[in-house]
C-alpha cells in the first residue's frame, strides 16, 4: 500500500520546490550576464553574486535530487537514458555556446584566446554534471543502495575530492586533466565535478524519499527554520570572519568549484531553509503566479540553454569588434531583463508552434542527431588541440582580456 500511495503522490507538484527552482533561474540569468558581459557591474551584481554563493548550483542540484526521487520513472535503465540525454544536450550547448562563437571570433581576429576557448566544447558544466549524476544514480540503484547510504557515499566523495585537490598534482596533459575534471577538481575546466557536487543531489534524493510522507509540511518548515537559521548564521559568521586553514577564501571561485564538505553542507542548509520559507508562503501565491513558477520550473534546462545562447555569442561579438565589455551596471541589468523575457518568449513559441526538443527525437533521427553532436565535438577537439599552447579555464579567466 505504501508503494501505491507513493506513486499517486508523485503526481502532485510541490509548489515550494518550483519556487526555489524559479528563483534560481532568475538569479542565474542575471548572474551570467553580469559575469560574462559586464566590465564592473557594481551594486546589483553583489546581490546576485552572493545568491550564487549561498544558493546557486546547490539549489538546482538539491531540487534535481528531489525530482529524481519523486519521478514516475524509477528503473536504473530509465535513469541511465536520462543521463545520456542530459550529457548530449550539454554537449550540444557547448558546441553552440563555446566552440562555434570562439571559432568565429578566431576567424575574425586571429586572436589566440578565441582558439583556446574552443576547447571548452568539453567542460564540466552543470548539464554535464547532471548527466553524470543520473548515470551514477542508475549504478547505485542497480546496486540497491539505499537513499541514506547514497548520502554517505556522496559525502565520502566530496571529502576525497578535497583531499586530492590539496595533495595531488593534476596531470600535465590537458585532455587527461579535462577528462578527470568531470569527476574530481583539476586545473582544467572542472567547474561542476561529480565528486564535489553530487552531495547536493544525494541529499535532495533522500529528501524526496521522505517528502511525500510528511503530513504537515508547514509545521516541518517551522522546525527546519528554528534549527537551521541559527546554524546558518553561526557557520557563515565564522566562515566570513575567520581564516580557516586549508579552506578556500570565502566567495571565491575556488570555494565555489571545490565545494568542500562544510561549505557544501552549509549551502544545503541555506537551500532547505529557503525551501521551508517558500513552503510557508506558497498559499499566498495567486493562480497566475503559480502557473509562471511551474512554467519556469518545468523548463529549467531550456532556460539554462537558451539564455546562454543569448549571452555568449554577444560576448564574442563585443570582444571581436572592440575588446570591451558593457560599462557600468545599467546596461547589463537591462540586457539581463531582455534575456529573461526573450528566453521565455522563445520557449513559449517553441512549445506552442515548433515543438522541437532534442531529447524527444525518436528512432533513426534520434540516433543520427545524437551521434552527430558527439562526432562534431570530437572533430572540434582534433582540430583545435594541436594549434594551442594555453588552455582556457575558469582558473585563468578563460584568457580573456
Placement of each model-derived feature along the sequence:
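Alpha-helical transmembrane segments and their immediate juxtamembrane cytosolic regions
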Residues: 1-401
Amino acid at each position: 500500500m505504501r508503494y501505491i500511495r507513493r506513486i499517486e503522490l508523485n503526481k502532485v507538484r510541490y509548489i515550494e520546490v518550483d519556487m526555489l527552482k524559479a528563483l534560481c533561474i532568475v538569479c542565474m540569468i542575471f548572474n551570467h550576464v553580469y559575469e560574462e558581459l559586464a566590465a564592473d557591474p557594481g551594486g546589483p551584481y553583489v546581490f546576485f553574486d552572493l545568491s550564487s554563493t549561498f544558493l546557486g548550483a546547490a539549489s538546482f542540484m538539491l531540487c534535481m535530487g528531489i525530482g529524481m526521487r519523486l519521478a514516475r520513472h524509477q528503473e536504473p535503465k530509465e535513469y541511465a537514458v536520462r543521463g545520456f540525454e542530459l550529457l548530449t544536450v550539454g554537449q550540444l550547448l557547448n558546441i553552440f555556446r563555446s566552440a562555434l562563437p570562439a571559432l568565429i571570433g578566431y576567424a575574425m581576429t586571429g586572436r589566440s584566446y578565441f582558439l583556446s576557448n574552443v576547447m571548452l566544447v568539453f567542460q564540466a558544466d552543470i548539464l554535464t554534471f547532471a548527466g553524470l549524476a543520473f548515470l551514477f544514480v542508475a549504478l547505485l540503484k542497480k546496486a540497491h543502495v539505499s537513499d541514506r547510504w547514497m548520502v554517505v557515499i556522496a559525502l565520502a566523495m566530496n571529502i576525497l575530492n578535497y583531499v586530492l585537490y590539496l595533495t595531488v598534482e593534476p596531470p600535465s596533459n590537458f585532455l587527461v586533466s579535462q577528462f578527470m575534471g568531470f569527476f574530481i577538481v583539476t586545473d582544467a575546466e572542472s567547474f561542476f565535478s561529480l565528486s564535489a557536487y553530487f552531495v547536493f543531489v544525494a541529499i535532495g534524493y533522500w529528501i524526496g524519499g521522505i517528502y511525500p510522507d510528511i503530513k504537515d509540511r508547514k509545521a516541518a518548515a517551522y522546525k527546519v527554520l528554528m534549527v537551521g537559521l541559527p546554524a546558518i548564521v553561526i557557520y557563515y559568521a565564522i566562515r566570513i570572519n575567520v581564516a580557516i586553514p586549508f579552506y578556500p577564501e570565502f566567495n571565491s571561485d575556488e570555494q565555489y568549484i571545490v565545494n568542500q564538505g562544510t561549505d557544501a553542507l552549509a549551502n544545503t542548509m541555506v537551500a532547505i531553509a529557503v525551501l521551508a520559507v517558500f513552503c510557508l508562503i506558497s498559499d499566498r501565491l495567486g493562480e497566475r503566479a503559480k502557473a509562471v513558477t511551474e512554467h519556469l520550473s518545468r523548463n529549467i534546462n531550456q532556460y539554462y540553454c537558451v539564455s546562454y545562447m543569448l549571452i555568449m555569442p554577444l560576448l564574442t561579438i563585443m570582444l571581436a569588434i572592440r575588446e570591451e565589455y558593457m560599462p557600468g551596471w545599467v546596461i547589463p541589468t537591462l540586457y539581463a531583463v531582455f534575456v529573461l523575457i526573450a528566453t521565455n518568449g522563445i520557449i513559449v513559441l517553441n512549445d506552442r508552434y515548433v515543438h522541437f526538443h532534442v531529447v524527444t527525437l525518436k528512432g533513426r533521427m534520434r540516433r543520427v542527431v545524437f551521434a552527430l553532436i558527439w562526432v562534431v565535438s570530437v572533430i572540434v577537439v582534433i582540430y583545435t588541440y594541436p594549434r594551442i599552447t594555453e588552455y582556457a579555464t575558469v582558473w585563468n579567466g578563460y584568457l580573456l582580456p
